[in-house]
Amino acid sequence: MKKKFPEYKGLDLAQVNRDILKIWDKNNTFKRSVRQRNGKGKFIFYEGPPSANGIPGIHHVMARAIKDVVCRYKTQCGYEVKRKAGWDTHGLPVELGVEKALGITKEDIGVKISITDYNNACKKDVMKYTDLWEELTRKMGYWIDMDDPYITYDNRYIETIWWLLKQLYEKGSLYEGY
């Protein structure tokens, strides 16, 4: 015999989500979670950065959910888990989008438009969807420090990568593989 269960029609998951986010905001839950473990073992998480020049999709939600599970697990193990957001700002799609928007080609850079103006247009364009990313981050309850992200076009980031590559080179850890 098939048993019937009544459907609960009063559950508004969107409202539950909003209520939880309000509580987290009011209690500063994310920052308190990190601060309460200050001085314990450290676990630093640098997000493999999304590109802010594209609209976030469901695959980003899935990837971020996995990242968040790892960080929350480490928190439950007693670690002080600092989570650093980042923005990937390099890539051909950014350049092609800016060239199309400006009505120029690669050959026009330095001729019809200065390199500085072109770079500034790319920097502006690549960050155009950060508000959507921040909204998604908040709505999904993904705990990460969005206040001080690393940005791959920032000279500090680039110089750090160069320094790291130099260290690897000097240790003989880099080789040509072709």
Question: Locations of the language-model features?
Answer:
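N-terminal, positively charged nucleic-acid-binding surface of large information/translation enzymes
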Residues: 1-178
